[in-house]
Amino acid sequence: MNGEYRTKKSVTVKDEATVSQNDNSIAVDPRLDFAVGRMGIPYKDWGLPKTDWVRNPVNGGVFMPKKHVFSKAEFESGMGGKAYHDGWAPGSAMNIQYLSVRDAKLLYAECLANDGDLAGAMAQVNDIRRRAALDVNIVKNADGTPAANYKVAEYPTSHAAFSNKDVCIKAIRMERKLELAMEGQRWFDLARWGGDYMAAELKAYVDYEKQYIPKFAGATYLPASKTMFPVPDQQILDMGNDESGQPYLVQPGPWK
């Protein structure tokens, strides 16, 4: 949780002696509660999270992963890896989704934006946001009411993302973060967007966590030059040179 799903400062109260409370009047993107377990919000069909669901909130915070955790119904049917549920680290036999239509559409949006078709790119983004706003995609309480103040809307055509390439690409990248959170995509996105971008995102994450989690107090920042592994020397040799005698692969400066 680094503030991306909401527009106001977090007011979550954390205290190991009490149940954490959220101010659910703050508008949040509905995808937050599909990706992150929050106190006071139904956790799939397991009910409301309790304080003891998090072993040490002061050390790790009060939020929990959600997308790849099996539901109670899946657990009871044996789909969740029933043989491995005992102990402090339950196992799961649930499949991991490697590629989805959502992922493909947002990758396509990136391609369109890079080729200059900003309207086409934002149409893909708006498709994703329109789906996120559907009632079926809203986490609800037992009585059928929304579990929080959910808000997500399409980008209007007057938005700068429809006319400014940099703004458009920024919007697409944000949408990937919101839509694909906790699905194992993030590192690969940061890697292909470049070392400088990755370093900036990691710094923003650490700076935010330092406000709440003591273990981040002494955290240092990863320089952009160290966000990527060096290219294997043998791979550079195997690729050979082009017609002008220049190598197809070149070792990045920090690793030469």
Predicted feature locations:
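Acidic/polar-rich alpha-helix caps and helix-coil junctions
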Residues: 1-256
